[in-house]
Amino acid sequence: MVGLGLLTLVLPRLAGQTPISKIAFGSCGHQDHPLPIFDRVVEHEPDLFIFLGDNIYGDTDDMEVLKAKYQMLGSKPTFQRLKAEVPILATWDDHDFGRNDAGRHYPYKAEAKEVFLDFFGEPMATTCKDHEGIYQSYYYPVNGNMLQVILLDNRTFRDKLQPYNGEVADQGRYFYDLDYAPYTSSDSTLLGETQWAWLKGELSKPADLRIIGSSTQFGIEFNGYEAWANFPHERQRFLDLIKETQANGVIFISGDVHYAEISKLEQEDLYPIYDVTASGLSSTWYFATPNQNRIEGPIMDNHFGLISIDWEQADPEVLMEIWDIHDNQRVEYRVHLSEIGFSEE
């Protein structure tokens, strides 16, 4: 277990509050919608809420338009209640970054970052101000354990996606048009070298549970849409980095797709990597793509994700849940920290 003296970076706004044991999260909420889901979130009394991207649908090169859309979100009574009662962290995806499926070539990414930080404020405004992009990490000591929250930036440094041209055998699984193909070479990047170097440093720090927020799905198989599967060498690099740093307790949370599911990645010499997707604060989609890594879901109704940790157990238990707009529990999956860590020799 990690002692409190090993790390001292604790969010000022959370100091003195109840230790973090319940984290809510979600993505894909349209500013034109009433967003009643935030009332459901608050009713569950989480210690933290994480926005995983598409927090608004900006889709503009005009920063005044982008600001106005954030202001529309900020004017929602349900958002105001969430902000007043629950500490917030946030990263972005393409629609709040600026353009659909955009990456590092988007010309207004610096301006969009400024608008993002102006809206969400602290602690992101301090954490992200001195480097390009909005990748960030936070540490919370809890009962002699350490919780680490890492939020990735999947937009600022990402190379262009490779258009799909029939590279993948259909086999009758794909009942829709595929947009993108996976790279077959390793000369492209999703995170960029600066973020990779930072990430290695973060994973090298001691923690018992690491919640890693990725705006796009990490754990799914290739589906022809945006995901880490389009950059298979980058996903493998991440898995190899977990092994290299012996980083225990990694669980991904993700968004983007307008439905919920849990995916499970298994690889030799590595504990199972879970990816809890919660992507439908107000947006919906009419189908879920094939995903042989799916172990729970899909849930197509509006929803949010919830991770609860029972730190009082000798082997703390992590509960992963999806709750829908009607306050129905739709997914329940449990693991102990001993199941998501490297065996001690």
Model-based region annotation:
Residues L14-E345:
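Metal-dependent phosphoester/phosphodiester hydrolase catalytic core
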